[in-house]
Amino acid sequence: SGPIQLWQFLLELLTDKTCQHIISWTGDGWEFKLSDPDEVARRWGKRKNKPKMNYEKLSRGLRYYYDKNIIHKTAGKRYVYRFVCDLQSLLGYSPEELHEMVGVPPRDDD
């Protein structure tokens, strides 16, 4: 309860099949990529009634999570982040189960 937090909002988009063109799982655990960071920021601003929201401000919100061990940035990849908190117990799904639900193709790492 309470106002929605950025990480919850991102998770909401990530579990919505219709949002896969702007944000999606990479198929590697809880890693995800903002394919259209400006659109993600616009929607976040709309949700929070902050019309001036942009990716720069949104990424500041994401950086705030680094120390809290909620989300980390994936080094060397632009707009790629990873949930490092225990999402599995929070959601009751493994990343693989969640990927399957939203239609993320499994990775071939063999």
Curated annotation (Swiss-Prot):
The protein's role, per its UniProt record: Probable transcription factor.
Native source species: Lytechinus variegatus (Green sea urchin)
Major location category of this protein: nucleus
Protein name: Protein C-ets-2
GO cellular component, one term: nucleus
GO biological process, one term: cell differentiation
Disulphide bridges, residue numbers: none
One example GO MF annotation: DNA-binding transcription factor activity, RNA polymerase II-specific
PROSITE patterns: ETS_DOMAIN_1, ETS_DOMAIN_2, ETS_DOMAIN_3
UniProtKB keywords: DNA-binding, Nucleus, Transcription, Transcription regulation
Gene3D superfamilies in the cross-refs: Winged helix-like DNA-binding domain superfamily/Winged helix DNA-binding domain
Family statement drawn from the similarity comment of this UniProt entry: Belongs to the ETS family.
Subcellular location: Nucleus
The keyword Lipid biosynthesis is assigned to this record: no
Pfam families: Ets (PF00178)
